[in-house]
Amino acid sequence: MTSLPGSFLLSRSRLRLCHVRNTLAALALLGGALAGLHPTAARADETAICYNCPPEWADWAAQIAAIRQATGIRVPFDNKNSGQAIAQLMAERKSPVADVVYLGISSAFQASRMGLLQSYKPAHWDDIPTAQKDPQGQWFAIHSGTIGFMVNKDALDGKPVPRSWADLLKPEYKGMIAYLDPTSAFVGYAGAVAVNQALGGSFDDFQPALDWFARLQANQPIVPKQTAYARVLSGEIPILLDYDFDAYRAKYQDHANVEFVIPREGTIAVPYVMGLVKGAPDAANGRKVLDFVLSDAGQKLWAAAYLRPVRPVPLTKEMSARFLPASDYARARPVDYQRLADRQQAFGEAYLKTRH
């Protein structure tokens, strides 16, 4: 096994420590909301299996602890990503193990098309925007992230914080910009769709994005295949195309001098969804989990993890103040999420052609 650099291990340790502190703070913050919920009389072995519920992503640790407190149901942590979760569901489709699953929006369409999910319309179903739920209830959004610029201001060497997609093409930012590979990372693809839509493209015309990426090559961008969060914190990457919740976590949890920017030309918001697994062995418990993540308490926990709750739940002034103003988020335009999913492979192929 390759040894990891000491600085990376130290960074990981600090992230874990801050994560624990954030989880405890979030649970304390929501104590009043949870106090009004009555736990069910559950046996110690009463569980609901969730695929792709990792404790360090979106603070699932706090959400799962709150589910246990409110319902008596234990949800084990699971570190799969969306693709791995779907592969596991396919392998187990004759004898399912999972009860619920958490997925990126593109993967939700795939899971539904493959017959891996069953219909369930949870409590607060009517609060979910129509475009962010399957009409039959096979999946529904629980929160979203908005694509923009995660900027480490200390690493800009005195240069101004970029405010637009056009700014990133300026030569002063040479060697400072990174985006995840859009052919292998969904957030990279989401960033490509964001710039394409902002510059007048569509799902039938990716040329604006392809031209923008071609021009960006003059600035020698860094293109990681996996998350680059720690590299932004260290200053190695001053500007990363990423979700807002990562930037807020860096600023408020890891206390980095990071700013999140929604570009002037516009961007997109990307939902993350959940659904009930077809043939779920503990479907009743799975339904209770799905009800909870959409409850006021559950939605406030997502906000405490710097995600945008799907429901318009009331937030504390402290929570609200940590997000950019609503006027900035108005630049995050809606997209057809079915088309977002359907056109992912086509964009990847077109992007690769421009790189050779």
Task: Give the ranges of each region predicted by the language model.
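Early extracytoplasmic/lumenal segment of secretory-pathway proteins
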Residues: 44-110
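A bilobed periplasmic-binding-protein/Venus flytrap-type ligand-binding module shared by bacterial periplasmic
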Residues: 148-155, 193-198, 270-283, 301-302
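Extracellular/periplasmic bilobal clamshell ligand-binding domains
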Residues: 319-356
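Short beta-strand->loop
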Residues: 117-126, 139-140, 166-169, 238-239, ...
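Periplasmic-binding protein-like
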Residues: 127-130, 145, 210-215, 221-222, ...
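A ligand-binding cleft/hinge motif common to bilobed small-molecule-binding domains
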Residues: 106-110, 233, 238-257
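Extracytoplasmic ligand-binding site segments that recognize negatively charged/polar headgroups
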Residues: 53-61, 97-236
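Mature extracytoplasmic/periplasmic domains
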Residues: 277-334
